[in-house]
Amino acid sequence: MSGLEALYWAQKYPEEVEAIVGLDMAVPDYYDEMNINIPIMRLGQYCAGLGITRWIPSLAESNAIKSGTLSQKEKEIYRAIFYQKTATVTMIDEAKAVKKNAGVVKEKGIPQVPMLLFISDGSGGTGFTKEKWRSIPKEYISNHNNASCIELDCPHYIHDYEYQRISEEIRSFIR
């Protein structure tokens, strides 16, 4: 959803945005096909409110904990935030509105700012095949003369896996 925010901001305030770097960001066309299950989110909210999610520690074992570079203290903080802030009212409201918001961004067209989009292999919870996940952003920027994609062979939360390469590519992009 943050990808939509970046695109919208660049559309609305083009003088404030010099470039967009997308870390496996979802462009508007993803939302045409994305299945957002609000009842499951509400169930998660209910379980979190009762503290049930704490009884299932594997729920908080995200890629950030398994594959990232968090210290032990940071992992504890991450888990505490996860247990307290799972499926909040704001998160559910955002999920309910995201398809409409994607339509607004899509209608305004692609912002004409430089873009560098990192694309995962689509695994890790996107709900798309590798081919489909990668084809949508490529198509999105296909008529943009200052945009490129870099494919990474890792799950959706690419910053947990390819942070070194991402850092190097961003440094090169902004020079």
Model-identified regions with their sequence ranges:
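Flexible "cap/lid" loop of the alpha/beta hydrolase fold
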Residues: 11, 21-50
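The alpha/beta-hydrolase serine catalytic core
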Residues: 38-92
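Gly/Ala-rich beta-loop-alpha elbow adjacent to hydrolase catalytic centers
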Residues: 2, 6
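Short aromatic-enriched loop/helix-cap "lid" or pocket-rim segments at secondary-structure transitions
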Residues: 31-37, 128-130, 163
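Conserved serine/cysteine hydrolase catalytic core
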Residues: 70-145, 149-150
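Catalytic active-site module of serine/aspartate enzymes centered on a nucleophile-bearing elbow/loop
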Residues: 142-175
